[in-house]
Amino acid sequence: LRENKSGGASSIQTSLPARNIGLSGRFTYAYDGRYFAEANFGYNGSERFAKNERFGFFPSIGAGWMISEEKFWNQDLKNIINKLKLKGTYGLVGNDNIGAWNDRFFYMSEVNLNGSGANFSWGQDFERNVGTIDMIRYRNDKIKWEIAQKMNLGLEVGLFNIFDIQFDYFTEYRKNIFGERQTIPYEMGFSAPLYANKGEASSHGFEVQVDANHAFNKNFWLGVRGNFTYANMSM
């Protein structure tokens, strides 16, 4: 259970403690320095969503194979390729940090009882004024976690006990992105914006890192690192 409090809140809503609850676990497995596996999960709850959307389950898995530790990888190969490893991961990541801080409780409407859109005056000198009620936000019980699906495939290569090369290809697909609806006709009579989990985005790319290390003697060695990253995103 995690609780955050704001000391400079500007309203009753933002002054309330923010609370999240979560349960997580991790399982790892390794055999003979050759085979590796890992599984993680998170079961998280957020106060920002209605009861039917409050909790989300976000698992991930990963695996690796150290090919250079297999018996068929003889010494002649190791003198050239001293390390060869394949690895991959896939998982889901949830995000409840969406919208503005004033929009904490999406399942509750918010109104301003002293609205400035119109007011009424009466009395002999018209000194009595009553403001109207302004709608700030409409409730939406369907607002839920933003979810990112992430995948990574990697290759690690060691050459001549000098060079270490890492190559990673990654993809990410995000859905349920929170945003304002732009296609609501004025004839429907809404006086405040409408929000929903309406967006999607995807990205992919790769990253290459090369390290070179060489010891000239016991007192002098040299290390050099270079990397390159490419990423492309579409919405």
Residue ranges and their predicted role:
Residues 1-235:
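Extracellular/periplasmic, surface-exposed regions of secreted and cell-surface proteins
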